[in-house]
Amino acid sequence: MTTKYIFVTGGVVSSLGKGIAAASLAAVLEARGLKVTMLKLDPYINVDPGTMSPIQHGEVFVTEDGAETDLDLGHYERFIRTKMSRRNNFTTGRVYSDVLRKERRGDYLGATIQVIPHITNAIKERVIAGAEGHDVAIVEIGGTVGDIESLPFLEAIRQLAVDIGRNNALFMHLTLVPYLAAAGEVKTKPTQHSVKELLSIGIQPDILICRSDRAIPANERAKIALFCNVPERAVISLKDVDSIYKIPALLKSQGLDQLVVDRFGLQCGEANLAEWEQVIYQEANPTGEVTIGMVGKYVSLPDAYKSVNEALKHAGLKNRLSINIRYIDSQDLETKGLEVLDGLDAILVPGGFGERGVEGKILAAQYARENKIPYLGICLGMQVALIEFARHVAGMDGAHSSEFKRDTPYPVVGLITEWIDEEGKVEVRTEGSDLGGTMRLGSQLCHLVEGSKVRALYGSDTIQERHRHRYEVNNTLLPKIEAAGLKVTGLSADKKLVEIVENPDHPWFVAVQFHPEFTSTPRDGHPLFEGFIQAAGEYMKRHLN
């Protein structure tokens, strides 16, 4: 079957939730038995978001094949079963980089390189490659219609719709329909102007998703349909909801999936949303609440830890517990003291980079260890747990990571000096290597030790988890740390690198080098987070009694 394309654009303002709306539609189409994939086209000049500040951009989502991508790909994987790859996200910078490399190589035979056709052709080629082998490809264009940065992408999808035939392409536009309290009504003019902007570049939207804080009345939807030249049934009201996992059912109730199926002439059954109904039921009916302290350096923007936040909530669903995440700036532990950790049922230290706030994270790991509070360390969260244990239990005073202190007497964590690149070649890295694309990335095999907590949680002796780091546990200092009581319970495929450590003298103290949050979904959860939240619930009950 010819792949059908749904191009998703946004207008009026940014942060309307294009990614979640697109992923929700994908979930309903998948529930109808269609093979669906999603792509995100980002208009910034960075080659990828790998070196961008999480406070500016939010989290970097890592795919199975090791691509550093936009956090929207995390939404895609949480809503549909299809796994994303480096083909599912690309930026203006990546496209220009490819085109310029071809120009230097002489591929264009002396032609003048222009946005049209060279850049737009490169965009179209990447979209087609990413969509290959699927019934439906939903392609989200980052940014807002009217932004200068988005123009090459919008021109490329306009051309692509012509190339593949309009019966194989559909344009879905998200807009804001604000409510003015003074007038006591919603206003449609911003939507009309946004569509006018889209029309000026040759794109007539087929479906309008109208975002608002309330349901949009039928008469206003009719008005939008009239002025924006779309059928009334193609004006979808998407009001604010208390859970993003309600959106698939909300879109289905307005017939959006049927509209798409009819437009493309697809033969498929009705959508079965039973799994999503179960998620919503679990979310609405918790039996208790636990407070998780997330100790990090990017806590001013919770989206910097988007997948961790969601993974905790997924584990809450499985344990029938409501999750209250208390964001704690790790520097506050250094300046305000340990009282900021009072009242927590568990402590989580997520990944991060740079020296700022590291001592606060080490204090959090020490507090959790000494007070028997459930602890989950992720990536840097494992490294600080190791440093803390080395300093205060193993007698290695001044132990640190060479990332933060070059002259530490005990570099218990050190730089990966040799790694395998995307093409399978050995790459030597030093302190002076580029920051972009020089990490251990993607899904890696991990061996679990028999009798360990993680072996019981996963129910398997090998697992696959995703990595994003350039520093590893220093094996030469490991025997002394293990002799003091910390146990290595997970090892890399070649059994040379430490992936998981546990403290057997603690009710629940697990720290991992990988990022388990990237594989957690609302329907399936993740065993590590489920075990962590279960331990938090047990800790909460013990202290209530």
UniProtKB/Swiss-Prot annotation:
<feature type="active site">
    <location>
        <position position="517"/>
    </location>
</feature>
<feature type="region of interest" description="Amidoligase domain">
    <location>
        <begin position="1"/>
        <end position="266"/>
    </location>
</feature>
<keyword id="KW-0460">Magnesium</keyword>
<comment type="subunit">
    <text>Homotetramer.</text>
</comment>
<keyword id="KW-0315">Glutamine amidotransferase</keyword>
<dbReference type="GO" id="GO:0046872">
    <property type="term" value="F:metal ion binding"/>
</dbReference>
<dbReference type="Pfam" id="PF00117">
    <property type="entry name" value="GATase"/>
</dbReference>
<feature type="active site">
    <location>
        <position position="515"/>
    </location>
</feature>
<keyword id="KW-0547">Nucleotide-binding</keyword>
<dbReference type="GO" id="GO:0004359">
    <property type="term" value="F:glutaminase activity"/>
</dbReference>
<feature type="binding site">
    <location>
        <position position="140"/>
    </location>
    <ligand>
        <name>Mg(2+)</name>
    </ligand>
</feature>
<dbReference type="GO" id="GO:0005524">
    <property type="term" value="F:ATP binding"/>
</dbReference>
<feature type="binding site">
    <location>
        <begin position="187"/>
        <end position="192"/>
    </location>
    <ligand>
        <name>CTP</name>
    </ligand>
</feature>
<keyword id="KW-0067">ATP-binding</keyword>
<feature type="binding site">
    <location>
        <position position="223"/>
    </location>
    <ligand>
        <name>CTP</name>
    </ligand>
</feature>
<dbReference type="InterPro" id="IPR033828">
    <property type="entry name" value="GATase1_CTP_Synthase"/>
</dbReference>
<feature type="binding site">
    <location>
        <position position="14"/>
    </location>
    <ligand>
        <name>UTP</name>
    </ligand>
</feature>
<feature type="binding site">
    <location>
        <position position="352"/>
    </location>
    <ligand>
        <name>L-glutamine</name>
    </ligand>
</feature>
<feature type="binding site">
    <location>
        <position position="470"/>
    </location>
    <ligand>
        <name>L-glutamine</name>
    </ligand>
</feature>
<dbReference type="GO" id="GO:0005829">
    <property type="term" value="C:cytosol"/>
</dbReference>
<dbReference type="GO" id="GO:0003883">
    <property type="term" value="F:CTP synthase activity"/>
</dbReference>
<keyword id="KW-0479">Metal-binding</keyword>
<feature type="binding site">
    <location>
        <position position="72"/>
    </location>
    <ligand>
        <name>ATP</name>
    </ligand>
</feature>
<dbReference type="Pfam" id="PF06418">
    <property type="entry name" value="CTP_synth_N"/>
</dbReference>
<dbReference type="InterPro" id="IPR004468">
    <property type="entry name" value="CTP_synthase"/>
</dbReference>
<feature type="binding site">
    <location>
        <position position="223"/>
    </location>
    <ligand>
        <name>UTP</name>
    </ligand>
</feature>
<comment type="function">
    <text>Catalyzes the ATP-dependent amination of UTP to CTP with either L-glutamine or ammonia as the source of nitrogen. Regulates intracellular CTP levels through interactions with the four ribonucleotide triphosphates.</text>
</comment>
<dbReference type="InterPro" id="IPR029062">
    <property type="entry name" value="Class_I_gatase-like"/>
</dbReference>
<feature type="binding site">
    <location>
        <begin position="15"/>
        <end position="20"/>
    </location>
    <ligand>
        <name>ATP</name>
    </ligand>
</feature>
<feature type="binding site">
    <location>
        <position position="403"/>
    </location>
    <ligand>
        <name>L-glutamine</name>
    </ligand>
</feature>
<dbReference type="GO" id="GO:0019856">
    <property type="term" value="P:pyrimidine nucleobase biosynthetic process"/>
</dbReference>
<dbReference type="GO" id="GO:0042802">
    <property type="term" value="F:identical protein binding"/>
</dbReference>
<dbReference type="InterPro" id="IPR027417">
    <property type="entry name" value="P-loop_NTPase"/>
</dbReference>
<feature type="binding site">
    <location>
        <begin position="380"/>
        <end position="383"/>
    </location>
    <ligand>
        <name>L-glutamine</name>
    </ligand>
</feature>
<keyword id="KW-0436">Ligase</keyword>
<feature type="binding site">
    <location>
        <begin position="239"/>
        <end position="241"/>
    </location>
    <ligand>
        <name>ATP</name>
    </ligand>
</feature>
<comment type="similarity">
    <text>Belongs to the CTP synthase family.</text>
</comment>
<feature type="domain" description="Glutamine amidotransferase type-1">
    <location>
        <begin position="291"/>
        <end position="542"/>
    </location>
</feature>
<feature type="binding site">
    <location>
        <begin position="187"/>
        <end position="192"/>
    </location>
    <ligand>
        <name>UTP</name>
    </ligand>
</feature>
<protein>
    <recommendedName>
        <fullName>CTP synthase</fullName>
        <ecNumber>6.3.4.2</ecNumber>
    </recommendedName>
</protein>
<dbReference type="GO" id="GO:0044210">
    <property type="term" value="P:'de novo' CTP biosynthetic process"/>
</dbReference>
<feature type="active site" description="Nucleophile; for glutamine hydrolysis">
    <location>
        <position position="379"/>
    </location>
</feature>
